[in-house]
């Protein structure tokens, strides 16, 4: 009984307007950031290295190189602070989790584009 109530409440919270993306894709994520009284959008662009599908608890990890340092950020897929996700390019990979990219540098970390 209580399980059905939880599912009903969670289904109301799910976002419906999310694009289809996979690990290996380059995405630009717009996040609402609150600084004091102001609120602005912050863009984070990088490669999706992991995706976790758990209904309302779904998340994905995006990795980018900023000033020579690798930066990874985990986003909750259905979070209200997540404004939009824009898929810039599709990557052709054969793994679900691309954690091996953490050790790769330069051209070795490139991902082929899906045609």
Curated annotation (Swiss-Prot):
PROSITE patterns: RIBOSOMAL_L19. Gene3D superfamilies: 2.30.30.790. One of its GO terms (biological process) is translation. This protein is located at the 30S-50S ribosomal subunit interface and may play a role in the structure and function of the aminoacyl-tRNA binding site. Keywords: Ribonucleoprotein, Ribosomal protein. GO terms for molecular function: structural constituent of ribosome. It comes from the Bacteria. InterPro entries: Ribosomal_bL19, Ribosomal_bL19_CS, Ribosomal_bL19_sf, Translation_prot_SH3-like_sf. Disulfide bonds: none annotated. Pfam families: Ribosomal_L19. One of its GO terms (cellular component) is cytosolic large ribosomal subunit. This is Large ribosomal subunit protein bL19. Belongs to the bacterial ribosomal protein bL19 family. The lineage of its organism: Bacteria, Pseudomonadati, Pseudomonadota, Gammaproteobacteria, Chromatiales.
């Amino acid at each position: 009984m209580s399980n059905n109530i939880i599912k009903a409440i969670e289904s109301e919270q799910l976002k419906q307007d999310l694009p289809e993306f996979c690990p290996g894709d380059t995405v630009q994520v717009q996040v609402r950031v609150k600084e004091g009284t102001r609120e602005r959008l912050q863009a984070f662009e990088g490669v999706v290295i992991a995706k976790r599908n758990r209904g309302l608890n779904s998340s994905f990890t995006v990795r980018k190189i900023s000033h020579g340092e690798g930066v990874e950020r985990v986003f909750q897929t259905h979070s209200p602070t997540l404004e939009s996700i824009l898929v810039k390019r599709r990557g052709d990979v054969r793994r679900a989790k691309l954690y091996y990219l953490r050790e790769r540098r330069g051209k070795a970390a490139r991902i082929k584009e899906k045609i």
